[in-house]
Amino acid sequence: GSYISVQNAIMALIVKSANDVATVVAEHISGTEREFAKLMTKYARDIGMKNTTFKNASGLPNKAQMTTARDISMLSHKLITKFPKQYDLFKTEKFNWNGKIYKTHNRLMQSYIGADGIKTGYIRASGFQLAFSAVRNNKRLIGVYFGGDTGKQRNQRLSFLMTKAFEGLDIISAKKASIKIKD
């Protein structure tokens, strides 16, 4: 067998969605991937993810496995707020392992102003997916998109939606600043 350090395993999961590494980590932690998925589902319930059931560590297809964009946004928010040091890893655009450089699938990290990370995914049933976070003017937005036909389409649509949401926040802030209170 091969060996991989915990740090490199984490980077492989974040940057390249290394499904084989997800299985190895799950088996190391819980004995089996199935037991690990049960722990993941329990944690999901504990943080309010009511519509998520995990059946494996990687997110690869399983008829009994499901989630929603809302639940993934809750998980993303929890990661950002409860584990800021670990969340910082989700900004990583590339890493080197065994002399090879691996690059992220999250192209918005390079092109979207204020981007600070999170995670891509893909399965045939729900297409190209992305949980994405950006900060502008000290305001953070988390966007989750499922169903892209291509990674490029997913990125364009989520970029558009995030930009519109930030513009909406700016309008709300401007309105609040212009409200006059009568004495």
Regions found by a protein language model. Name each.
Residues 1-70, 80:
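Active-site-adjacent loops and short helices of periplasmic peptidoglycan-processing enzymes
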Residues 49-53, 61-66, 70-183:
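Domain-terminus/edge residues, biased toward the C-terminal soluble/receptor-binding domains
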